[in-house]
Swiss-Prot record:
It comes from Vibrio campbellii (strain ATCC BAA-1116). The keyword Chaperone applies. GO terms for cellular component: HslUV protease complex. The gene is hslU. A double ring-shaped homohexamer of HslV is capped on each side by a ring-shaped HslU homohexamer. The assembly of the HslU/HslV complex is dependent on binding of ATP. GO terms for biological process: protein unfolding; proteolysis involved in protein catabolic process. This is ATP-dependent protease ATPase subunit HslU. The keyword Coiled coil does not apply. Keywords: ATP-binding, Chaperone, Cytoplasm, Nucleotide-binding. Its main location: cytoplasm. ATP binds at residues 18, 60-65, 256, 321, 393.
Length: 443
């Protein structure tokens, strides 16, 4: 789990996301509180529940990007889901409990990788011995027992040295490795994915652990044998227990598009994908026990971060019980022309940086001037204001339109240099931006 301070988390988010300081502060505090809670005594730790967050803001202002970056920083089980993918219990579709099952799968995979990393050195040592056995089979006595002779031992050390120096990488050897498990594909109706996974696991277990002789280059053989030896050294039951503990205490669920499951207007009849889903989410967020293939998972201390544009619906359209379970409200501001300018240049691997690097592969130099970047930002902002406001995503559309000709002719223009200044931007985009009807369809 991440031990970064709130200030460090915000600093890291600033490298990729422009503005939205309130949202960054809220998620940074929530993430740090996960660490603080784990430092408490057991009796008090049980009482401290996470303060779930609701992020409100128009499309394209950074809600989803904050979630993506948070996932990398958290170093904890994290899953992002779309609220619109779920239906209430009893209808065809995914049930909300699959969120926790998927989160547990993420945790098991994460814990497995960490466990494999810990035993990597021992596994590589054992793999090395198996490769040396294949290169120099030990002599056996009349009873079939292996004999260790001094000259054989010396030869083995010579081969070990060559193996470590990579001199034998391309030599082929025949080894016994675990046969790949047969994949059993089972078509299941929606909502029954858990049962399908259990059936697939059952069929794979029936095959058992069989060995198969394979001819591999030593480099590939070392890798295959190291993985096999590492798997033997890892205790699967302990691994599952550790993963479930990690989910229950450090797990984070990001629910996007939550505004799309609000009930709109005075509609009559069942609202399968809206209010019913909200009611199903209640026990998960409040705290319940979910059955997964790895064991029972309690959701009492999982942090939930929900986000939505709320352009048609309002946060008050969520059912009152769900509103109460998302106590921290953060409003993200719409982006200005100046924000667009910063987005084009400041973040790590910014859009302008990406286009310069892409054209460099064709030996074409592209330079963006200060006034050119200002003009691109203003063009994107103008189109957002006059048509539909899609936030920073508009920059992708404008940049593609702007770079279209250079990208198409790049192969024939190797060695040339293009300067993207205000005049070039106006020339390429001017007419389209001024004609509102045209910009609706092109930008």
């Amino acid at each position: 789990m991440s031990e970064m301070t709130p200030r460090e988390i915000v600093h890291e988010l600033n490298r990729h996301i422009i503005g939205q300081d309130k949202a960054k502060r809220s998620v940074a505090i929530a993430l740090r509180n996960r660490w603080r809670r784990m430092q408490l005594e057991e009796s008090l730790r049980v009482e401290v529940t996470p303060k779930n967050i609701l992020m409100i803001g128009p499309t394209g202002v950074g809600k989803t990007e904050i979630a993506r970056r948070l996932a990398k920083l958290a170093n904890a089980p994290f899953i992002k889901v779309e609220a619109t993918k779920f239906t209430e219990v009893g209808y065809v579709g995914k049930e909300v409990e699959t969120i926790i099952r998927d989160l547990t799968d993420v945790a098991v995979k994460m814990t497995h990788q960490q466990a494999m990393e810990k035993v990597k050195f021992r596994a590589e040592e054992q793999a090395e011995e198996r490769v040396l056995d294949a290169l120099l089979p030990p002599a056996r006595d009349a009873w079939g027992q292996s004999e260790q002779k001094e000259d054989t031992s010396n030869t083995r050390q010579i081969f070990r040295k060559k193996l470590r120096e990579g001199q034998l990488d391309d030599k082929e050897i025949e080894i016994d490795v675990a046969a790949p498990q047969m994949g059993v594909e089972i078509m299941a109706p929606p909502g029954m994915e858990e049962m399908t996974n259990q059936l697939q696991g059952m069929f794979q277990n029936l095959a058992g652990d069989t060995k198969k002789k394979r001819k591999l280059k030593i480099k590939d053989a070392m890798k295959a044998l190291a993985e096999e030896e590492a798997a033997k050294l890892v205790n699967q039951e302990e691994l599952k227990e550790s993963a479930i503990f990690n989910v229950e205490n450090n797990g984070i669920v990001f629910i996007d598009e939550i505004d799309k499951i609000c009930k709109r207007g005075e509609s009559s009849g069942p609202d399968v994908s809206r209010e019913g889903v909200q009611r199903d989410l209640l026990p998960l967020i409040e705290g319940s026990t979910v059955s997964t293939k790895h064991g029972m998972v309690k959701t009492d201390h999982i942090l939930f971060v929900a986000s939505g544009a709320f352009q048609v619906a309002k946060p008050s359209d969520l059912i009152p019980e769900l509103q109460g379970r998302l106590p921290i409200r953060v409003e993200l501001e719409a982006l200005t022309s100046n924000d667009f300018k910063r987005i084009l240049t400041e973040p790590k691997a910014s859009l302008t940086e990406q286009y310069i690097a892409l054209m460099k592969t064709e030996s074409v130099d592209v330079e963006f001037t200060e006034d050119g970047i200002t003009q691109i930002a203003e063009a994107a902002w103008t189109v957002n204001e006059t048509t539909e406001n899609i936030g920073a995503r508009r920059l992708h559309t404008v940049m593609e339109r702007l770079m279209d000709e250079i990208s198409y002719d790049a192969t024939e223009k190797a060695g040339e240099k293009f300067v993207i200044n205000a005049a070039y931007v106006k020339d390429r985009l001017g007419d389209t931006i001024e004609d509102e009807d045209l910009s609706r369809f092109i930008l």
